[in-house]
Amino acid sequence: MAIHSSSDALVYQSGFGNQFSSEALPDALPVGQNSPQKHPLGLYAEQFSGTAFTVARSEARRTWLYRIKPSAAHSRYQRMDRQMAGQEPGPINPNRLRWNAFDIPAAPTDFIDGLIPLASTSAAEQAEGVSVYLYTANTSMQRAFFSADGEWLVVPQQGRLRIVTELGLLDIEPLEIAVLPRGLKFCVQLLDSSARGYLCENHGCALRLPELGPIGSNGLANSRDFLTPVAWFEDSRQPMQLVQKFLGELWSTQLEHSPFDVVGWHGNNVPYKYDLRRFNTIGTVSYDHPDPSIFTVLTSPGAIHGQANIDFVIFPPRWMVAENTFRPPWFHRNLMNEFMGLIDGAYDAKAEGFMPGGASLHNCMSAHGPDNVTAEKAIAAELKPHRIDNTMAFMFETGKVLRPSRHALDCPQLQTDYDACWKDMARTFTQEPR
């Protein structure tokens, strides 16, 4: 398919969870019904369902597509010779783990071939849990892809991306994210020479905004800052490979048309993007460090009320003003399981070893917290207002244990000396108050 210039002006629709509608040509959207006998433009009506028909209306996600060829027009899928190597779970390992950034490959590698499986909570056929990947790429996709296994949350760390989807175009860059519904066909084009980032595949309930509770009606990620594409299509009869991820395996078929042939659509099962720089950060103006749940951007609810299947949490630039307080994130043992990445700058709990493009994993009850250098500085610091700037760390937090993949445990990026950052914690105890 053609590579679309980054200078092309993209238009978006604003809002979260809306019943959106868009058409690239007049009369693409039928009036008063979803599936007319004869569409005025000769298009096929196709429903794209992200939930069961009988879920509560507030949970229902579906979109009606009006396209040149129905998605059913394809030949038999064949299992691909090239699969994602090393994605099977490695040996059980309760240790705290940290990885250096993965290098951009030298050989031509597109977004799909560049997926690196790091950890997963469960088998893909279970309608819960998450899988975590890194991606590295140096060439645009010349094929289309969709995942039958889950919703994708894409977090760029290096390089801008244009994501061509059935419902339109999304441009994202580092400090922005994109969410792609389960089953949505897309193609990732590079707007720079290379790209690297993180990917969370959500096998459970679709991501949504967290409840605000006593915070009130505003704050955290605001609905109006989420952007959904407008209809865009290509009418092409050039053959194109379509790859799907099904139960963790890659299968492909050959299309005799473009899968990006949706001329109009309406519904709420849609892709979207969000600029993390627009997050309205909440924090203390008195004392102590609040729980990190105040930094939640998106959440997928789990089976236990109040315990998320996945929370997407960020640690953005912010002011630290707490009085008489140890200001870094405190030492912690947690029921939840925490995968962290760093998009930009430095993380305020780790002075060394955690670099942009790197990652860490602290599973259930793994003791963690600020490293020795950070703790010493925080205890001795003069407590005046301080701004943490030029930073963006994030966390995928899940109620299920994340099993590292065999590749994640065997790769050279794994830091074998991670535990050493807590080795020389000073003994400051005294029986007489200071």
Swiss-Prot record:
Active-site residue list: 289
Q: Superkingdom, according to UniProt?
A: Bacteria
Q: Which reaction does it catalyse?
A: homogentisate + O2 = 4-maleylacetoacetate + H(+)
Picking any one GO molecular function of the record gives:
iron ion binding
Q: Which UniProt keywords apply?
A: Dioxygenase, Iron, Metal-binding, Oxidoreductase, Phenylalanine catabolism, Tyrosine catabolism
Q: What is its EC number?
A: 1.13.11.5
Positions in coiled-coil regions? none
Residues bound to Fe cation are 332, 338, 368
Q: Which residues bind homogentisate?
A: 347, 368
Which PANTHER family does the entry link to? Answer: HOMOGENTISATE 1,2-DIOXYGENASE
Entry function: Involved in the catabolism of homogentisate (2,5-dihydroxyphenylacetate or 2,5-OH-PhAc), a central intermediate in the degradation of phenylalanine and tyrosine. Catalyzes the oxidative ring cleavage of the aromatic ring of homogentisate to yield maleylacetoacetate.
Q: Which family does it belong to?
A: Belongs to the homogentisate dioxygenase family.
Put simply, this protein is called: Homogentisate 1,2-dioxygenase
- Organism, by scientific name, is Pseudomonas syringae pv. syringae (strain B728a)
The lineage is:
Bacteria, Pseudomonadati, Pseudomonadota, Gammaproteobacteria, Pseudomonadales
